């Protein structure tokens, strides 16, 4: 039986969570998304790869590089080898192929699930960065962490209620009219101040409680797409400024 644990990831720069090739190569699924909120997620394989790299690069004076690699494989599983290693020569026999592929991956001591959003930073021209979430994301955060717990008042020690948008009858629209909060596609209206949002800021993060916004579950995907940084990833030839594979 595994011992369950969770962690909070605070990204200090735009995070690439999609495929390395974009629409120019026919890839229409540019980002890994949660099926319920259509917001970006970090696959567990990416998190495991980061831990593997840190463990391999760590300085262990009492261990050789091979011993460090073996220890990494024990904790995070044997790394999958490239497919081109199969049958590199025409003389590869079936027995040799079996020997090279049977131990490609092994069970790890540590298993990672995907990382979901809690607060999403959205750029607002002329205003501070605002952090947006929805009740469904906060509910998932509460189920995983078992909190937050109210620290003051009559309800001290109780589980905090999941905050909801101020007006449940009217969804959030991005309108071309003047209102409280301006996004890059319009204005966000129907905003009310909620003091209880401070409980939903993970401890140790630098998110300002005054810059938090909770929207409807149906609207978080649109705002999420607005907040994405559009950037095409390309690889140039070494000797000429020309994109490879084109």
Model-derived features with residue positions:
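Basic, Gly/Ser/Thr-rich N-terminal segments that form RNA-phosphate-binding interfaces in CRISPR RAMP
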Residues: 1-246
